[in-house]
Swiss-Prot record:
An example Gene Ontology biological process: translation
Name this polypeptide is given: Large ribosomal subunit protein uL23
PANTHER family: 60S RIBOSOMAL PROTEIN L23A
Domain of life: Bacteria
Function: One of the early assembly proteins it binds 23S rRNA. One of the proteins that surrounds the polypeptide exit tunnel on the outside of the ribosome. Forms the main docking site for trigger factor binding to the ribosome.
Database matches in InterPro entries: Nucleotide-bd_a/b_plait_sf, Ribosomal_uL23-like, Ribosomal_uL23/eL15/eS24_sf
Amino acid sequence: MSAILKHSEERLMKVLLAPVISEKATFVAEKNEQVVFLVMPDATKPEIKAAVELLFKVQVESVQVANRQGKQKRSGRFNGRRNHTRRAFVCLKPGQEINFTEEAK
């Protein structure tokens, strides 16, 4: 819990943007017992760990982050690009679980 105290709760509430629900994220969750989140571009590993522990009341073993480049897209003669994203792969300690499919109470 000491990691939570080092960062302000207001900042930690903004670090996690959304869980990633995709075929690849589901495969990683089943095989490696990891959960994937979209996070703020300037979020650090300790902040991500503290935010997950605060919001979901679980213990985090490790955090890996990946910066994904936005895809180049074209509409007619105009070129554009999707936004860059940062994903966090959060490995939970054995016996811990986050279930996004169950109903909110």
